[in-house]
């Protein structure tokens, strides 16, 4: 999982 606030797709 990615950290909070992280946007993989922006």
UniProtKB/Swiss-Prot annotation:
GO terms for cellular component: extracellular region. Keywords: Amidation, G-protein coupled receptor impairing toxin, Secreted, Toxin. GO terms for molecular function: toxin activity. Its main location: secreted. The modification Arginine amide is found at residue 10. It comes from the Eukaryota. It is found in: Secreted. Has been extracted from the spider web. Negative results: does not target bradykinin receptor B1 (BDKRB1). Causes constriction on isolated rat ileum preparations and relaxation on rat duodenum muscle preparations at amounts higher than bradykinin. Is a partial agonist bradykinin receptor B2 (BDKRB2). Has insecticidal properties. May be related to the predation of insects by the spider webs. Belongs to the bradykinin-related peptide family. This is Nephilakinin-2. It comes from Trichonephila clavipes (Golden silk orbweaver).
């Amino acid at each position: 999982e990615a950290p909070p606030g992280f946007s993989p797709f922006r």
